[in-house]
Amino acid sequence: MLNKQSLTVAIVSVLCCAGVQVDGAKPAKGGGGGSHIQRGIQLAQEKHYDAAADEFGKAIKDNPKDPRGYANRGTAYRQAARTAIEAGDSEGASTRYQAALADFAKYIELAPKDASGYTEHGQTLSELKQYDAALADFNKALELKPDDIFTVKFRGFAEIGLNQWDKAVADFSAVIQKKQDDLQSYDRRALAYRSMKNYDAAIADYTFLITKNPNDMEATTKRGYTYSLAQQYQNAIADYQAELKVNPQDNDTFQRMQYAQSMLAAKNASPSPTPPIPSPTPEEEKRLMDKISPLYIGIGVLALLIIAVIVRLLTRGKAEPSSHRIR
C-alpha cells in the first residue's frame, strides 16, 4: 500500500512542480528548459526515472536558478532509488537518495519560503530512516503551510519511526478528518493504536478498512493479530481462517492461528484443584500434648524406681561406719 501510494505522490509531485510557479522563485527564462521538463515528465510517467532525471538535469542547465528543475530531478532520483531497492540494488539506491537530497536542498536554498521543498527533503530523509531530521523538515514545512495534509501525513510516518505513537495518532486523525477516504492513514493509525495497547481503537480502524474492501486480507490478518493481543482468541482465529482460505500457503498466519488456538484451549480448560494439605489446629496440638504428657510422666517414675533399686543393691553388705567416740 505504501509503495503504490508513494509512486502516485512522486509522479503528481513532478507534474505539480513543472506546472506551477514555486513560491519565492523567479520565473523561468525562455529557452529549451520547458521542453526538457515536459520530456522528463513523460519519462517519469513511463517509469524511466533515471532518464527523466537526465532530462530535468538539462532543464537545470538551461535555467539553473529555477527551483522547479531541482524539485523535479530530486523526485525522479528518489523514485529511481525506490526502484533500485525493489531490484535489490542497495548501493544504487543509496547513490540516488543522496542525489535526491542534494537537489531538494538546492530547492530549499532557491525557494526558502516554499513549504514543498522541506516536505520533499523530509520525505526523502524519512525513507532513509533519518526520522529526527525528517521531523524537523516536516515541522518547518507546516510552519509555512499549516493546512498541508500531505505533510501532516508524512510527519505521522516519521513519528511512527520514532515510536511517538500518540503524536502519530493525532496526525493521522487530522488527515482522516480532512480526507476520510485515505485508507493508508487508517492503517497507520491502527498500528499506532495497537502499539499503545489501545486494541479496541486499532480493531475499529482495521474493521473500517475491511468494510471498505472485504478482500483486504492484509487488514484482516492485522486485525486478527490485534485480536490475539487483546486475548480475543476466537475472533483472531476467525480472521486467520479467512486469510488462510484465500492464501493457504501463508505459513506465518498459520502459526499465529495455531498459537491463538492453543491459548484459547488453555483459557477454556478447567483447572483441577489440588487439595490442600491440612495443618494441625491449636486444639489438635493440645489434644496431642494431652496424650503424650502421661506417657512421659510414667516413664520418669519408672526410671526413678530402677535407679533406687540399683543403688540399694550396690550398698547391701557393707559395714556401717562406727563412731570412735567413747560412749
For each feature predicted by the language model, list its residue ranges.
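Register position in tetratricopeptide repeats
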Residues: 45-46, 79-82, 86, 127, ...
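Canonical positions in the second alpha-helix
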Residues: 58-59, 106-107, 140-141, 174-175, ...
